[in-house]
């Protein structure tokens, strides 16, 4: 997955992804996280992030995730609207004018013709991570809602920290 690229032999961070096929509803994502945290407590320097797509989930469902993320300073929430593919697209372009998931995927495939959601070829993202962070931050108009209402991604908030931690470890 995308986040595994931050795990390296020299890294002082370890990114673990809790995945479950076809169980991406916000309440299921939150349940898996709570189960994991009950089984394995966070250390002081650890963080736990929920990374979800807006998809067709409603505001009340996402609000549950947001509420959880405010319960501990080590918790975070990253939402991409319409989906994580939008965050990947920002590695290559500014993402303006994307109005649907289909359009987002079509534009992403211009840059990653072999793209498949279950296997992101991170080596093909090149040095676009910092550009993606910059572009996502510029588009971040979340305000009081805490996640993008239109096309956007707050994944940059997590990736910024991963990049900073990676830099500190080198």
Task: Specify the residue positions occupied by each region the protein language model found.
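Short N-terminal binding/cap micro-motifs at the start of the first secondary-structure element
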Residues: 1
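C-terminal accessory helical subdomains adjacent to catalytic cores in phosphodiester-
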Residues: 4-21, 27, 33-49, 54-170
């Amino acid at each position: 997955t995308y986040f595994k690229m931050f795990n390296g032999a020299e890294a002082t961070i370890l990114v673990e992804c809790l995945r479950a096929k076809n169980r991406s509803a916000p309440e299921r994502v939150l349940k898996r996280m709570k189960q994991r945290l009950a089984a394995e407590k966070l250390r002081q320097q650890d963080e736990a992030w929920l990374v979800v797509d807006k998809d067709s989930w409603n505001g009340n469902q996402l609000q549950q995730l947001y509420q959880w993320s405010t319960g501990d300073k080590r918790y975070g929430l990253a939402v991409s609207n319409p989906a994580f593919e939008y965050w990947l697209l920002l590695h290559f372009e500014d993402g303006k004018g994307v109005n649907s998931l289909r359009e987002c995927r079509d534009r992403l495939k211009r840059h990653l013709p072999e793209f498949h959601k279950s296997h992101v070829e991170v080596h093909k993202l090149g040095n676009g991570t910092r550009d993606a962070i910059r572009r996502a931050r510029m588009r971040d108009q979340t305000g009081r809602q805490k996640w993008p209402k239109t096309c956007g991604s707050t994944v940059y908030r997590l990736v910024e920290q991963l990049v900073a931690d990676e830099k500190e470890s080198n």
